[in-house]
Amino acid sequence: MRKGCYILLLLLMGLVACQQEIVSNDPSLKLQFSHDTVLFDTVFTTLGSSTKCVLVYNPNKNAINIDQVEIRDGKHFFINLDGENNIDQLRDIVIRGKDSLFLFIKAQIDPLEENNPVLLEDDIAFRVNGNIQHINLQAYGQNVEKIRSDSGLVIYHNLSLTNERPYLLYDTVAVTGNLAIEEGTTIYMHAGALIYAYGNVIAKGTKDQPIIFRGDRTDMLFDSVPYRMASGQWEGLYLMHTADRLPSTYTLDHVNILSGSIGLYVYSEATGSILPKITLSNSKIHNHSIYGLVLQNVNAKVYNCEISNCASYCVYLSGGKHDFVHNTIAAYYGYPYTDLNIHNNIIADDVAAVYINNLSKNTAKTVSSFTNCIITGRRKQSLMVATPLPEHYEGSFEGNYLRSDSLHEAFAKNNVYASDSDSCVFRNIYYLSKQYHYYDFHLDSLSPARGIGDSIATLSYPTDMVGLPRKNKPDAGCYEYVEEL
């Protein structure tokens, strides 16, 4: 009796299995796709893209047969369906009811005639029960000038970078002479790439054609998070001066340095009165996994700049004369209201946005002034001045908005200090990926940094970072307030 029951059960299971394998040719039964358009952002020619995945799903009760899968052109895109990448073999593929297949897609683009990005499109066609269903493929192809070496080090005496096409740096690039970068030039930096410049540097962008240093990942980290929002993608830009050379001059205007480990590191071995000089203006240094701007034994003039969101100091100063006017220095890296950890290292709560080191005996004399700046962030002490005694520090703070304890009156006057109730300094101090809210350090309409600046200092800087005229009673920071559109 028991043996008969087992046989009956096996027969029933076989009947059910047979019913599940029924392949329907009903033309009303169609496939569903997790995406009907697959977009690859910028794909560098000859290098290929990352791989994207689409789920091909049969929502119906019965199995259906995919008669054929075709790519209309097949020049720029390659597919793999359920482990098969030979397009000629993609025929008579059965998908059971309520089952699915994985479709993998990659873009590979040959060199183009245009230097500007070119939109390339193709189409995947699924022939099912007399119907044709499509997945549209799109990619922006971009020619790039690659700089790389088998040794991992590329050395130039002098180097001029033009805006004819972007550059892609793979290795350590050392420029022993002069480095010149034309307006509108974009330099993509591969993981581990960095630049050492030992001579003069001239990098002059414009408001409409800035110079950009950024990582080379142009795809998505997650569905709603572009890779460009992840820090630590490349090493940094180092301007180095050795004691056996004449002091260098560095001029950087409208330069955006984004999402590296260290943004801009300027260092000199000299400790005397003659030091290298840097002018950094109308520029953004944002989202770095260690430091933003480091100045050691350098005379610097920094104005109309945003230096923001670094895991360690946004600004570190030690040795030299540093003049900061109308800058926004905002340290909200990994702020608690951020819904996704897209950063690559641990944030120390006791690290200030600005750290001025007046303790080291092996540096030039440190003299720093901050006028009409914003220095704030997630930490209670966003400004630290390390000095043996306040009267030993030769610096000044005037017309600033500061998140710190009150500074010594010997070097500070007419500043506004943040209170715990100041929650609206900027438009946005967090990142919510699903709502596409990203950090925005333009001033809020109720910002306590509005109208607090010193008007005399502004005479030398009549416009803000984006070219807007400053008011008679100027706002602190690099952005003059405007109503949000």
Q: What are the residue ranges of the model-derived segments?
A:
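Sec-dependent signal peptide recognition
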Residues: 2-9
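Short acidic/proline- and small/hydrophobic-mixed sequence motifs that coincide with surface turns
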Residues: 49-50, 61-66
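Asparagine-centered strand-capping/turn motif at beta-strand->loop junctions
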Residues: 56-60
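Beta-strand/loop edge motif enriched in small/polar residues
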Residues: 21-24, 31-42, 47-49, 53, ...
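Short, solvent-exposed loop/linker segments at beta-strand-coil boundaries, enriched for Pro/Gly
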Residues: 70-89
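C-terminal motif of bacterial Sec signal peptides marking the signal peptidase cleavage site
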Residues: 14-17
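Conserved, structured regulatory domains from eukaryotic proteins
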Residues: 475-477
